[in-house]
Amino acid sequence: MTAPSQVLKIRRPDDWHLHLRDGDMLKTVVPYTSEIYGRAIVMPNLAPPVTTVEAAVAYRQRILDAVPAGHDFTPLMTCYLTDSLDPNELERGFNEGVFTAAKLYPANATTNSSHGVTSIDAIMPVLERMEKIGMPLLVHGEVTHADIDIFDREARFIESVMEPLRQRLTALKVVFEHITTKDAADYVRDGNERLAATITPQHLMFNRNHMLVGGVRPHLYCLPILKRNIHQQALRELVASGFNRVFLGTDSAPHARHRKESSCGCAGCFSAPTALGSYATVFEEMNALQHFEAFCSVNGPQFYGLPVNDTFIELVREEQQVAESIALTDDTLVPFLAGETVRWSVKQ
């Protein structure tokens, strides 16, 4: 990576955790990712969820149809794990190059997760098959029991689900997605080479004070929820250390404005337009720009066993204002950092 003071040239990055939705929303948001990223792991939590090879093939085609001419973008599809999923269907999708990974949502943990897994035991045959064929498991790591505080759900998941699972299936490759706590940062750092993590821009830039002090900021509300500043700092220190099993996963999750700014608002930040510059800002603040390219463009492919991208992009360090909103057919979409001045942006 070359880093003159005002320009960062890096190998084209990938987004290892992305929501593209479907229909008109899909057509609106895809270009914001495809113009920057070479590949993206696409989440399967549609309604109904993507649980078959045929559904994934059809969804992939809808995504590709929304990619503008001149963008070189490959969506990497995932299978939504359910209690009733057939291991043979999963293996077929993996062998045919349709499924790159499978996603574990604890039932009702986040948007469109009501079909999720009720217990690890219920999907053990599927997980055993994944371990056997080398298919990565992507985990939304929160317990969902009503009696457990929302700020404690990730830490409790580690001790009650993640560690027992990894002890039981020692060869299973696991990505602990969108980690938000010091507990998770320490757990991944101390784990073996079969455990990795993604981190979102909002969890590196903000903590729960930013979301709640002086008024509720619904466009910072996501799941897992922002935590206290000691957890934010642990995440920042993990990425700044150059640790090679943590990588870019925006968890960009678009919702129309009226679904965010509501008496019962949806969780998710639409960060695709601003995420890469946000990450660059964090790495610069941590005096760690020398590790920025690996986080964005190398660590993910390395863990997944895929080649790195062979093209490059540039970010420029000049103040730019983020758009207040993006037009949808019958509403607007508010991007992460809407209306704010950002320090780094992708060179057009």
Swiss-Prot record:
The EC number on file is 3.5.2.3
User: Hey, which pathway is this one from?
Assistant: Pyrimidine metabolism; UMP biosynthesis via de novo pathway; (S)-dihydroorotate from bicarbonate: step 3/3
Please give the function described in this protein's UniProt entry. Answer: Catalyzes the reversible cyclization of carbamoyl aspartate to dihydroorotate.
* Upper lineage: Bacteria, Pseudomonadati, Pseudomonadota, Gammaproteobacteria, Enterobacterales
Among Gene3D superfamilies, the record links this protein to:
Metal-dependent hydrolases (3.20.20.140)
Catalytic reactions on record: (S)-dihydroorotate + H2O = N-carbamoyl-L-aspartate + H(+)
Q: Which Pfam families match?
A: Amidohydro_1
Q: Which PANTHER family match?
A: DIHYDROOROTASE (PTHR43137:SF1)
User: What is the name listed in the Swiss-Prot or TrEMBL entry for this protein?
Assistant: Dihydroorotase
Positions carrying N6-carboxylysine = 103
Give the matching InterPro entries: Amidohydro-rel, DHOdimr, Dihydroorotase_CS, Metal_Hydrolase
Quaternary data: Homodimer.
GO BP, sorted A to Z? 'de novo' pyrimidine nucleobase biosynthetic process; 'de novo' UMP biosynthetic process
Write out the residues that bind Zn(2+) 2: 103, 140, 178
Q: Which residues form the active site?
A: 251
Query: Which HAMAP family does the entry mention?
Result: PyrC_classII (MF_00219)
Q: Which organism is it from?
A: Shigella dysenteriae serotype 1 (strain Sd197)
Q: How and how many cofactors are bound, per the record note?
A: Binds 2 Zn(2+) ions per subunit.
The entry lists its GO molecular-function terms as:
dihydroorotase activity; zinc ion binding
> Which residues does Zn(2+) 1 bind?
17, 19, 103, 251
Q: Which GO terms describe its cellular component?
A: cytosol
